[in-house]
Amino acid sequence: MPEALAQELAFPGGVIWQVTLDPPPAQLPAFDDRSAYLVLRDGHVRAVDHATGGTRWTAPASSTVRPASSGRHLVGADGVTAWAIDADSGREAWRRDIGSTAAAVPAISPAGAVFLTEQGDLVLLAWVDGHEVWRARMPAPVSAPVVAGPDHVFVGLDDGHLLAIRLGDGATAWTKTLGARILEMTSIGDRLFAGASDNFLYALKPKDGHLAWRWRTGGDVAGLAVADQRRVYFTSLDAMLRAVDRRHGDLRWQRPLTTRAVGGPTLAGTQIIVSGVAPELHAFRASDGGMTATAPLPGRPLHGPFLAPEHASAPLRLVLLTAGGHLLAIGQTVEPRLVPLDGLPGKKLPPEVLPVIKR
């Protein structure tokens, strides 16, 4: 999951490019370092170069869940049929029947794509050809998007249990009981952060599930967390943005938001960007939480913004989809560079000679 990039984002900056889709996409977009992927309502998937806003390719595919990208493959599912598309060319890589309708966005792991079915099965499909590596039945309804780490898949259940499933064989490595229904999880380095409906953010050690710390808020912790080397940043349904010590969980600062957050915050260098139900983004200083800028949007944001890496043809930028089908990139807008002319443009004309007027 994302940690801070070295470059600093120019915020609020301006709109680098904008694409309007009518009708809007059927699912929230997937992102990787090169593209944004949109599931269109006409049975196609479009890859948009998020440096320029241009279409890289369009492929015939539908998905009843939000897709996900590994950088090499884009994966999704149309009902019971899971599929993978080559992210570079747009060609279909494979299709597989997973036995039951896909229930959530697939998790991206080193071993393959992990799908959750409506029957409660977790299914790992290999990257190479989509064959089923293992299948594991969950003991209770899954309440949070599945998250993959280097060695485990983490599953949050409606009854408050958090499971670590081994990627190698699908067996349960450990189980931890939290205080309530698990809503969201984020795996960052040596910590697994879990938000729950008891208003706590929990920090666990991924290798054994040991509880490192927890912090109570005034509302459900329903969004992803982000972290730098010192602090963890997260929002909750009490419309607050908080920073806590990454190692010990002590509160460093908290700031009220003007609206309820949509998705989790985005960390860009020394700034934290938060989207809400209003058509705008807000930036806060990571050091003390002071709000520094606001950027207007053409519609209500549908997810937390994706931080796209700096490219030869584009600066560091935020990419997001808003209500109304507006996909846009926000960052530093660069005017064309001024260069000296080798010669004057146009055709050389002889000097005009005015007639002599006799009086």
PLM feature spans:
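Short loop/turn segments that connect beta-strands within beta-propeller blades
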Residues: 49-52, 86-89, 126-130, 166-170, ...
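Sequence/structural signature of beta-propeller modules
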Residues: 1-10, 339-359
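Charged, low-complexity, helix-prone segments enriched in Lys/Glu/Asp/Gln
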Residues: 8, 93, 133, 212, ...
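Repeat-blade elements of multi-bladed beta-propeller folds
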Residues: 22-44, 59-83, 87, 96-123, ...
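A short beta-strand motif characteristic of beta-propeller blades
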Residues: 14-19, 54-59, 91-96, 131-136, ...
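Short loop/turn and low-complexity linker motifs enriched in small/turn-promoting residues
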Residues: 7, 17, 280, 290, ...
